[in-house]
Amino acid sequence: MINEEALKAYLKKEFKDIIQVDIRKLGSGVQGSGFLIEMKTQSGIRSYVVKTLLSEGLGHDYPSDRAAVFLLDLDEYKNLPRHVKGIDVLAEMEDGSIKSIGGGREYYLLMERGTGRHYFNDLTEFSKKDSLDEIDRKKIEAMTSYLAEIHSVKKDSKTLYWRKLRDTVGHGECLMGVFDTYPDGTLSYYEMANIIKKSVDWIARLKPKYRRLCQIHGDFHPGNIWFQEARSQKSEVRSPATIFPPFPQSGGFALLGESPEATEAKEKRGKGGFDIDFVLLDRSRGPWGDSADDITALTINYIFFSIRHHGSVKGSYFEGLRMFFEKYVALTGDEELYSVVAPFFAFRGAVVANPVFYPDLTLDQRKLIFRFVNNVLDDDKFRLEKVNDYLG
């Protein structure tokens, strides 16, 4: 229900000549409800309608979804002849008060700053190694332990699980949206459509698995994982963090520096000879989904970087890929993971094969990534031992 007292307080603040305000519900539909606002003023009666949206289904699941609908309404109602005009977009705050958020020309996010070395640096160094060293393994243990922990938070919602499946294929930031940013000639429209169709078929297979819904990061790729300098447990000396510029897979910029609150909130993982600390950036596209989203966001990069450097998946890259999956499954018992990753790998494969993000990739390297995507989609489950067969 709408907060009538807070709404009346907002109206009396915005319309100075109000004598009396009456609010009554007009009715409800499949998307939401409408409320009639009648204001008695010195110049007569003025009438308005407040519209609400239901909080689950039709892509209106999160408050930000509903805000986006209303902000677009406010901008565009006035641009169509004979259409009623929007007056404002109202937000109900934590304390119950109502304030205006309408009328902005653009919107920005103010956030904390973070420091460190993003995991892309480690992946680049893998090309110089035949096998992982102790710090490499500790970082993988730290990441898989972290994911196992956040993924243990479950939610019972068929709607939100199905939305994550739908968004993975159709969202503007996911498979179809990424393909739409490809320069013409990179991949034919038919080839793009074929990958999309296969991914849609996977949605039908995964819909019954809605019990998998869990808390996720949503964009757990190397550019969003910033490690602090690995510190020996025998020493309190730590080298200064190195600062790096923006990275290609991120939806935003790397933000530098760190507040005391961010330092306190850092995840500390790892046992044995080193403490491994990291901080995360750019959680994306909602708090709930399938753990496969986070797992593939990271592991596609072992495959991608190995293709860039070796033309196949081998050496420290294959070791990292195998260790990441095996450690995570050992921690969670989620053997089903291998049977659900395919459409998520399709999305992440489209990202790393994108010439806009990685213009230095050769045509042959892109072809290997697309073969991987198609062959994983064609298999009934992802098999680590077949990773190079998927490139063929």
Model-found features: residue ranges?
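Regulatory N- and C-terminal appendages and interdomain linkers associated
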Residues: M1-V30, L36-S47, G57, D61-V69, ...
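Active-site acidic catalytic loop and adjacent metal/ATP-binding pocket
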Residues: L26-K40, G44-I45, V49, I150, ...
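Active-site catalytic-loop/activation-segment of kinase and kinase-like phosphoryl-transfer enzymes
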Residues: Y107, E112-G114, A148, K155, ...
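A glycine-centered beta->alpha junction motif in the catalytic cores
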Residues: S55-E56, R113-L132, L175-D184, F304-F305, ...
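Active-site activation/catalytic loop segments of kinase-like enzymes and analogous catalytic loops
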Residues: R285-T332, A346-L363
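Conserved ATP-binding subdomain of kinase catalytic cores across diverse folds
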Residues: S33, K40, S47-T168
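Intrinsic disorder/low-complexity segments
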Residues: E229-D275
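All-alpha amphipathic helical-bundle segments outside canonical DNA-binding/catalytic cores
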Residues: G333-F345
